A protein has these predicted regions:
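C-terminal engagement/docking regions of AAA+ P-loop ATPases
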Residues: 2, 11-93
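Alpha-helical substrate-binding/gating segment
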Residues: 8
């Protein structure tokens, strides 16, 4: 849960994003990560579950600023950068 919170906060601090992921968006990420883990036959979520669904869940939930649009940057590109910048917790269980 802390990892999802850190990712959501990072979208609000990213200079190319005008409006980042909301608390409700973070809940959607958490729910989808749980569903992804279930489909992988696990009853727990690992960071890779969050990373696997993050772009799909969040791309339509952010609003890019004009600089990003002028630079022809897509939401997925910026969210990929956010994933790289936020430290992932240890997935060992």
């Amino acid at each position: 849960l802390q990892y999802v919170t850190s990712l959501a906060m990072a979208t609000r601090e990213q200079e190319m994003i005008r409006l980042g992921i909301s608390p409700r968006g973070a809940l959607a990420v958490t729910r989808m990560a749980k569903a992804h883990a279930y489909l992988q036959e696990r009853d727990y979520v690992i960071p890779e579950d969050v990373q696997s669904i993050f772009l799909d869940v969040c791309s339509h939930r952010i609003l890019l600023n004009p600089r990003a649009k002028v630079a022809n940057m897509a939401a997925g590109d910026i969210l990929t950068q956010v994933l790289k910048e936020v430290k992932s917790p240890d997935s060992g269980r």
